[in-house]
UniProtKB/Swiss-Prot annotation:
Catalyzes the attachment of isoleucine to tRNA(Ile). As IleRS can inadvertently accommodate and process structurally similar amino acids such as valine, to avoid such errors it has two additional distinct tRNA(Ile)-dependent editing activities. One activity is designated as 'pretransfer' editing and involves the hydrolysis of activated Val-AMP. The other activity is designated 'posttransfer' editing and involves deacylation of mischarged Val-tRNA(Ile). L-isoleucyl-5'-AMP binds at E560. Zn(2+) binds at C890, C893, C910, C913. This is Isoleucine--tRNA ligase. One of its GO terms (cellular component) is cytosol. Monomer. Pfam families: Anticodon_1, tRNA-synt_1, zf-FPG_IleRS. Belongs to the class-I aminoacyl-tRNA synthetase family. IleS type 1 subfamily. The gene is ileS. It comes from Caldicellulosiruptor bescii (strain ATCC BAA-1888 / DSM 6725 / KCTC 15123 / Z-1320). Its cofactor is Zn(2+).
């Protein structure tokens, strides 16, 4: 007889093989065609809001793994909050202005940006940006990320640009915007100023040089010293030889000691603490100190520039340290922030002997026309020939590079527009402390950055961006910016976009009758610079959160990579504090970078770049989503094919658990078949308690944004509590009991609860799989169209806190673990095959023996053995003996029983199976 026909074997359309890459698009279609995201919002529209404001990715290429990690983490936050009942509108955004797009368009059109019509050029830039928004939009949707994809925000949107102009106007009105000559990061390749957030540091090997500046006016300090006719030189040290044409001073520290060192034919001045190191580096063996002065004594000593007809004044500065060099700092106010500031105090004028493209100007004398990098060698040769080069040293140091073109940048003093951070620094620091930073070290990171940061250079010498809305009087050159002009321009931009600045005449951009407040002239010129793109994205909170009715300012969360402490987190904070006095966010959550399997940075040159679509097309988006939580995302995340393959195994275990549950619920309708708690079998009560513990821990982990903990909790529950224990134990009563028996319905009742809860718990992370499970649940108490339209599972506190139940089952599982080891030994010795082939005898001391006897049927069921005996022992340790089971094997349930075959029809089944078969 085919006994399988009499068993309740699992039935489900939920496939064992996931085939995610092929199946996921079906669910994307389902979500889109059924407006699931819209219905999620509708379901919670009257509830408390949770607003995550999207940091806009740059619209200039396919998405990379960093983008994928970022968007998936945001999606997890939003989906969890929505399932908890929060109203969670999510507006994706794009950063669309700036240098990278300009460069791509220049390359594509093969044009010179200085010669091209700006309006036509901007049109091409816009087309380029929009084309990549469409590409990235589809790529983000393929990840399973929910959002208002057809209604995103873009920094090129006319209304966005208008709001940005108003933010600028508000800051100007408060006196935070000014124009000044200051050294800024300058990219000669891109011919524009850069902000700190646009700088990347790379390790460079270079030469540092020691240069002698001859003292020509010692203020009489050295007149009584035994110097004779020997010349005195102050020795400076620099790693940027090309800046020497800009030298106007030598800075000393007022409190340091400086030694005059006789080296035989001349006298050198260096910081006393550094004498030995300087002499050793420059291979000077014979020397002696002849005098010592405080730095403040040497103030206003004059030196002769080594190759230009100019003097260099000795000045004092607190920035001078003894960490490297000579303690005498080469000072070129046109090439350094500290140099500039210290020279300002001495009224030393600024010269900048380097042009926009990085070539030395006539102020560099004979080196004019050389590219700054090429001048290093030529200047060093000149110094050596004239006897001013004391020595050369090869060093490795971190040097700033342009984040866009990757070329080295220079410090160069130019006229730029700045936002004065000084004016609201204290407010910004207070705002930092009002925010929750995850991880906590983020607070110190951004706090220290704001403490130390200089004023924000917001002007760029480019075309594709939002113009700085300022005019200049043609007569007296006074800047014009008023509430009236800002409002007028903003209204034009609202209708026509910022292209209007480039296409319209000045008079069309100004209200009628506007005159210069200084000289009364009515003729004006437009500012030609545009705003830093960080001002664009940094203003997004003002446009997105305030202009959409369903959002609110401030938002609940910003979530980006940890490079954004000096980028978007900071630019948003500064514009918000400057205009509103507080941060635009309540929580800031950060993640690390994506690196390869060995922890190395990904780069095309290394050949170790993995595209998100390499993973999606082979393994599916859910595997990529699982990777996003498979490690601590607040640090750098490793990825490789091997790592992904390991994750597919973990995914398979979760999927198989769901499949087993689905397969055994094909005939269970919770509306009619559910068993009340008081009638549940004890093992089912225990499983329910384990489920509630899981829900409690997973909920806490989601609340704390600890998604790696969610991953481990769910995986362990599926493998340890379910597959290895509860579901394995349940197979007999699920398959072999009467289909409608209390025994089977009890198991199904709890398995149904487990399936529903587990599906919802994984939905924020494994969104496609959770939806697939949900659609395969035949009968549901709550017939929600999608898993995302249901509610977060609740907990019965009484069951969860039932300590007697927990303690009892801890003991039972401890006994099972001991017995399982002995069964494994017996299996290896070929004494038994399946555990049902065995009879187990347990030897235990009195109290444990009594416990086993009182719960013998339960323990035998948990052990999955055919027979169980227990005997008393004096030992504190439980001893287990395994024997072949008594009786014959039931052909239906495979348990051994001495009563097999002893029935009216002489069927080779046990009494339980006979009763079931007979009833059918």
């Amino acid at each position: 007889m085919d006994w399988s026909q009499t068993l309740n074997l699992p039935k489900t359309d939920f496939p064992m093989r996931a085939n995610l890459a092929q199946r996921e698009p079906q669910f994307l279609k389902f979500w889109q065609e059924n407006d699931i995201f819209k219905k999620m919002l509708e379901k919670n529209k009257n509830n408390k809001k949770f607003i995550l404001h999207d940091g806009p990715p740059y619209a200039n290429g396919d998405i990379h793994l960093g983008h994928a990690l970022n968007k998936v983490l945001k999606d997890i936050v939003n989906k969890y909050k929505s399932l908890q009942g929060y109203y969670t509108p999510y507006i994706p955004g794009w950063d669309t202005h700036g240098l990278p797009i300009e460069q791509q368009v220049i390359k594509k059109l093969e044009v010179n940006r200085h010669e091209v019509d700006p309006v036509e050029f901007r049109k091409k830039c816009k087309e380029f940006a929009l084309s990549y928004i469409d590409i990235q939009r589809q790529q983000f949707k393929r990840l399973g990320v929910f959002g208002e994809w057809e209604n995103p925000y873009m920094t090129l949107d006319p209304k966005f640009e208008a709001r940005q102009i108003r933010v600028f106007g508000e800051m100007a009105k408060k006196g935070y915007i000014y124009k000044g000559l200051k050294p800024v990061y300058w990219c000669p390749s891109c011919e524009t100023a850069l902000a700190e957030a646009e700088i990347e540091y790379q390790e460079d090997r270079t030469y540092s040089i020691y240069v002698k500046f001859e003292v020509i006016d010692d203020k009489g300090l050295f007149s009584n010293l035994p110097i004779g006719d020997k010349k005195v030189y102050i020795v400076i040290w620099t790693t940027t030889t090309w800046t020497l044409p800009g030298n106007l001073a030598i800075a000393l520290n007022a409190d340091f000691d400086y030694s005059l060192i006789d080296i035989g034919n001349e006298i050198l001045v260096v910081a006393s603490e550094l004498v030995e190191r300087v002499m050793k580096t420059n291979k000077i063996e014979q020397y002696k100190e002849i005098a010592r002065f405080k730095g403040k004594d040497l103030e206003y000593v004059k030196c002769k520039h080594p190759f230009l007809d100019r003097t260099s004044l000795v000045i004092l500065g607190e920035h001078v340290t003894l960490e490297a060099g000579t303690g005498c700092v080469h000072t070129a106010p046109g090439h350094g922030e500290e140099d500039f500031e210290v020279c300002q105090r001495y009224n030393i004028h600024v010269i900048v002997p380097v042009d926009n493209k990085g070539y030395l100007t006539k102020e560099a004398g004979k080196f004019a026309g050389l590219f700054y990098e090429d001048s290093n060698k030529e200047i060093a040769k000149e110094l050596e020939a004239s006897g001013h080069l004391l020595g050369v040293e090869k060093i490795t140091h971190q040097y700033p590079h342009c984040w866009r073109c990757k070329n080295p940048v220079i410090f160069r003093a130019t006229e730029q527009w700045f936002a004065s951070v000084k004016g609201f620094r204290d407010q910004a620091l207070k705002a930092v402390d009002d925010v929750k930073w995850v991880p906590e070290w983020g607070r110190d990171r951004i706090y220290n950055m704001i403490v130390d940061r200089q004023d924000w250079c917001i002007s760029r010498q480019r075309i594709w961006g939002v113009p700085i809305p300022i005019f200049y009087c043609k007569n007296c050159r006074k800047e014009l910016i008023t509430d009236e002009t800002i409002d007028y321009i903003a209204k034009i931009f609202e209708k026509e976009g910022s292209d209007a600045w480039f296409s319209k005449d000045v008079k069309e951009l100004l209200p009628e009758g506007v005159k210069c407040p200084v000289c009364g002239c009515s003729e004006f010129e437009k500012e030609t610079d545009i705003m830093d793109v960080w001002f664009d994205s940094g203003s997004s909170h003002a446009y997105v959160l305030e202009s959409r009715e369903d959002l609110e300012w401030p938002c609940d969360m910003y979530l980006e990579g940890n490079d954004q402490y000096r980028g978007w987190f900071q630019s948003s904070l500064l514009t918000a504090v400057a205009t509103k006095g507080r941060a635009p966010y309540r929580i800031v959550l950060t993640h690390g970078f994506v690196v390869d399997g060995e922890g190395k940075k990904m780069s095309k040159s290394e050949g170790n770049v993995i595209s998100p679509f390499d993973i999606i097309n082979e393994f599916g988006a859910d595997i990529l989503r699982l990777w996003c939580v498979s490690a601590d995302y607040t640090t750098d995340m490793r990825i490789s094919k091997d790592i992904i393959k390991q994750l597919t195994e973990i995914y398979r275990k979760i999927r198989n658990t769901a499949r087993f549950l689905l397969g055994n619920l094909y005939d269970f309708n919770p509306k009619t078949d559910k068993v009340g708690y008081e009638n549940l079998k004890e093992i089912d009560k225990w499983a329910l308690q384990r489920l509630y513990k899981l829900i409690e821990k997973v909920t806490k982990a989601y609340e704390e944004y600890d998604y790696n903990q969610v991953y481990h909790l769910v995986h362990n529950f599926c493998v340890i509590d379910m597959s290895n224990l509860y579901l394995d134990i349940n197979k007999d009563r699920l398959y072999a009991s009467k289909s409608e028996s209390l025994d089977r319905r009890s198991a199904q009742t709890v398995m149904y609860e487990i399936l529903i809860a587990l599906t919802i718990l994984i939905a924020p992370i494994l969104s496609f799989t959770a939806e697939e499970i949900w659609q395969n649940i035949i009968f549901k108490e709550e017939d929600a169209e999608s898993v995302f339209l249901t509610r977060w599972p609740s907990i019965n506190e009484d069951i969860l806190r039932d300590e007697a139940l927990r303690e009892k089952w801890d003991k039972i599982i401890e006994i099972k673990d001991i017995v399982s080891k002995q069964l494994e030994i017996a299996r290896n010795e070929k004494l038994i095959g399946s555990s049902l082939d065995s009879k187990v005898k347990i030897f235990a001391k009195c109290d444990i023996k009594r416990f086993i006897e009182e719960n013998k049927d339960i323990i035998q069921e948990v052990l999955i053995v055919s027979q169980l005996d227990v005997e008393e022992s004096d030992s504190d340790q439980i001893k287990v003996e395994v024997y072949k089971a008594d009786g014959s094997k039931c052909e239906r349930c495979w348990k051994f029983d001495t009563m097999v075959g002893k029935n009216e029809e002489s069927l080779n089944v046990c009494p339980r199976c006979y009763e079931v078969v007979k009833s059918k």
